Amino acid sequence: MNPDFAIVLNFKTTGDFDVDFLVKTARNIGARAVMSSDPAAFKEACEKYTIFLADEQAGLDLASVNVIDTMVNNRKNSEATIINIPVNDGKFDEATQKLLDTINSWMHQFGHAFNEGKPSPLTVSDGFILENRHADYQKYVFLKDIPAKIVVEGLDKEPNRVEWIEHRTELDFAMKDGKLTINLIKPDDVFDWNVLRIQAHRPEDNIIHTEF
């Protein structure tokens, strides 16, 4: 399966259901793949919304209180999280809707880093680091708690910018003896896991802009 598919919704359907609604729900919360025991029913909608239709595998029965922890810990180990989504006569029950809302809220902020992140050789004093598999000049620090500062080791050069992904709030940092010290301030909204971006020098930064 494509490594960019960090979460997969496994729809467990009984009775009638609107497949278009289900696939659109998956897309809207940041999932890039779905599965079902009735794949033929999902084929057209998946093509319509550019969602990958995976072969069905065993999934996890998760709740809003543990879904983000489970997703992040699996991603730390380069694993996708397959989440069982019960659908009864086309509807989600209250617990399932709360689960989906929790995923949506978190993925709305951090889905890009989460889907496209892979393990990084960098180390950090708290949390862990992923790097963008398509643009390795972007590193992502995942933090469960928010200390006053963190220290990142393994960078060759001082980065151009360090920021919370949420609202792109810049953070103060200093590089000395190969150690990047980042001073943290709490973001506007604190999630179960918070993510900051370390932006290194990019290839396009070498382009000289000429005005005519």
State what each model feature region is:
Residues 1-212:
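Mature catalytic domains of secreted/periplasmic carbohydrate-active enzymes
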